[in-house]
């Protein structure tokens, strides 16, 4: 019998083992769809971004008008831009859901997969930040100024790092040029990290809602999950295109319709919605260095998840106390997101400080204690 090229050809064999004949647990739920949705988001962002880059000019005098030109004069330029801007929001929705699922079902015990995933999140955040600066509107300019300025809180070398990042003594043309270069480069870095992420995942195999080894009853990825993923893709593209066509500026900041002006500060500087939780944590500490450390810790704390797992069971499926804590954490993140969008005044300051304290308390203290308590209750 002739050898099947799908199983013998060096390249096709890799694709086959990753997407077609991949042994997959038979009981994974829709929460496992977000990985493929993230891949779709990345491909969409790279494609729309490439088309936008063809019409964009990375110069402070021309950036704003080049974006306006893309929307007015380029064939479907408005649609490409709206898909790209809102695609970023959906990218973050998917990655937050993906992380939440990993946290709920104990997927972080695949340490290498989890750690590369956290690195992917950090790279995505960096990409989104430098991308937000490119239209060179008011919020782009002041967002870049405020966020890059945080590095000046680092003792001794902080100010030097900031001036090195800016390419001068303020956010100006060199900053915009290098941010464009970085925004073009980082998505390909994300694609590379994704391959590493998948390599580690396929080494250990997927987790499942029960958190138990399912080697004995695994099923091939195609056609079962490939079809299920296509449904997920349709359900993602529907709200994305609806948003891009009907309310493209819903999640944007009105300040960004005004060209950047270093002489006029917007009344309330805030990042895009997907960074607001971290921004609220940053603002909840009245000290600059303390705020920056808390901001970094808000994401880097994810690296500690495997070390803080004290339960004898992997998932939270049969741990009601941990479930309660998990959903409290989710609610807390919504509160932080809301606080980040509010001005720095009473009562928002105290709510932000309480929510920030709760965030770290739940993750670092309450989860391990609750896990140990549940072990005792189950006589483990």
Curated annotation (Swiss-Prot):
First-listed, main subcellular location of the protein, grouped into a coarse class: mitochondrion
Cofactor: binding comment: Binds 2 heme b groups non-covalently.
Residues that, per the record, bind a ubiquinone: 202
Binding site for heme b b566: 98, 197
KW S-adenosyl-L-methionine (keyword) present: no
GO biological process: mitochondrial electron transport, ubiquinol to cytochrome c
Molecular function GO labels: metal ion binding; ubiquinol-cytochrome-c reductase activity
Pfam family, one: Cytochrome_B
Alphabetic keyword roster: Electron transport, Heme, Iron, Membrane, Metal-binding, Mitochondrion, Mitochondrion inner membrane, Respiratory chain, Transmembrane, Transmembrane helix, Transport, Ubiquinone
Membrane spanning stretches: 34-54, 78-99, 114-134, 179-199, 227-247, 289-309, 321-341, 348-368
InterPro entries according to UniProt: Cyt_b/b6_C (IPR005798), Cyt_b/b6_C_sf (IPR036150), Cyt_b/b6_N (IPR005797), Cytb/b6-like_sf (IPR027387), Cytochrome_b (IPR030689), Cytochrome_b_C_euk/bac (IPR048260), Cytochrome_b_N_euk/bac (IPR048259), Di-haem_cyt_TM (IPR016174)
Lineage: superkingdom: Eukaryota
Gene3D superfamilies in UniProt: Cytochrome Bc1 Complex, Chain C (1.20.810.10)
Gene Ontology CC: mitochondrial inner membrane; respiratory chain complex III
Swiss-Prot/TrEMBL cofactor(s): heme b
Subcellular localization(s) per the UniProt record: Mitochondrion inner membrane
Binding residues annotated for heme b b562, in chain numbering: 84, 183
Membrane topology of this protein: Multi-pass membrane protein
Function: Component of the ubiquinol-cytochrome c reductase complex (complex III or cytochrome b-c1 complex) that is part of the mitochondrial respiratory chain. The b-c1 complex mediates electron transfer from ubiquinol to cytochrome c. Contributes to the generation of a proton gradient across the mitochondrial membrane that is then used for ATP synthesis.
Known partners and oligomeric status: The cytochrome bc1 complex contains 11 subunits: 3 respiratory subunits (MT-CYB, CYC1 and UQCRFS1), 2 core proteins (UQCRC1 and UQCRC2) and 6 low-molecular weight proteins (UQCRH/QCR6, UQCRB/QCR7, UQCRQ/QCR8, UQCR10/QCR9, UQCR11/QCR10 and a cleavage product of UQCRFS1). This cytochrome bc1 complex then forms a dimer.
Family membership: Belongs to the cytochrome b family.
Remarks, miscellaneous: Heme 1 (or BL or b562) is low-potential and absorbs at about 562 nm, and heme 2 (or BH or b566) is high-potential and absorbs at about 566 nm.
Protein's name according to its UniProt entry: Cytochrome b
Species name: Oceanodroma furcata (Fork-tailed storm-petrel)
Lineage of producing organism: Eukaryota, Metazoa, Chordata, Craniata, Vertebrata
